């Protein structure tokens, strides 16, 4: 799955893990489709890179709602977890690396007050982000929500590769990526930073998410972040599978 350059860098980065993590895969029963095979192959390849990483297929109630998918969780604390439905390759490879490191105990670069704000969020929040491997605006959103899921057991986040779940894309009316839902309702679309997501969450919950001051007041205007063309949501149709991750992107997670 990974070329030699990416594999070498990932192996080095996994040396930053502080605690055991587990990759829990959910695939179709026969696992004959290409993405299921690639999911199992990717998780097995990662597990071979560190003694602190193991992988196994989910059973019974452990199985995710979508297949193929895999859940990254702390071995001793399964409440610290994120899920990828599909393959986080292309532009999302850095999101995969950060998820592995953060769940493995490597500290986030987020400000201390932001981390405390996330940990103090109340209520149950089930986020889903629809992405494509070639989307340049998706990683910021995926990584922000992954961090929130890692830090707060009341928050769950699944990143969904839209091209693999076209029926769901059609049913939900997703027209562009990234699109984020919260508890089954549309939450936002377009590129957003962590601070914007926290402010938006505080806005839609009427302040019950706690600590909006740390992220600043909610932004006025629509949920889609205005900005240069490359910050606008990207259409779902016509997206290719994307190129492999740029190795220089990995510098951001060290």
Please describe what each predicted stretch is.
Residues 154-204, 245-254:
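C-terminal, charge/polar-rich interaction regions
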Residues 4-44, 119-153:
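Local sequence-structure signature of Cys/Sec-based thiol-disulfide redox active-site neighborhoods
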């Amino acid at each position: 799955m990974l070329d030699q350059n990416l594999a070498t860098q990932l192996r080095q980065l996994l040396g930053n893990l502080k605690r055991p993590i587990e990759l829990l895969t959910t695939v179709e029963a026969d696992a004959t489709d290409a993405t299921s095979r690639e999911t199992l192959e990717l998780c097995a390849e990662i597990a071979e890179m560190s003694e602190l990483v193991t992988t196994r297929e989910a059973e019974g109630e452990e199985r995710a709602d979508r297949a193929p998918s895999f859940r990254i969780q702390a071995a001793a604390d399964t409440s610290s977890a994120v899920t990828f439905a599909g393959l986080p390759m292309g532009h999302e490879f850095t999101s995969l690396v950060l998820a592995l490191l953060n769940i493995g105990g490597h500290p986030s670069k987020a400000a201390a007050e932001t981390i405390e704000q996330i940990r103090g969020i109340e209520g149950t929040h089930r986020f889903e982000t629809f992405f494509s491997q070639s989307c340049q605006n998706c990683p910021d959103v995926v990584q922000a929500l992954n961090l929130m899921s890692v830090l707060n057991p009341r928050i769950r986040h699944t990143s969904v590769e839209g091209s693999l779940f076209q029926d769901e894309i059609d049913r939900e009316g997703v027209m562009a990526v990234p699109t984020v839902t919260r508890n089954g309702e549309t939450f936002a679309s377009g590129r957003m930073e962590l601070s914007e997501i926290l402010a938006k969450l505080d806005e839609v919950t009427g302040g019950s998410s706690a600590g909006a001051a740390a992220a600043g007041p909610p932004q006025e205007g629509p949920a889609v972040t205005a900005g240069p063309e490359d910050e606008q949501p990207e259409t779902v149709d016509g997206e290719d599978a994307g190129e492999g991750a740029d190795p220089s992107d990995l510098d951001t997670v060290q």
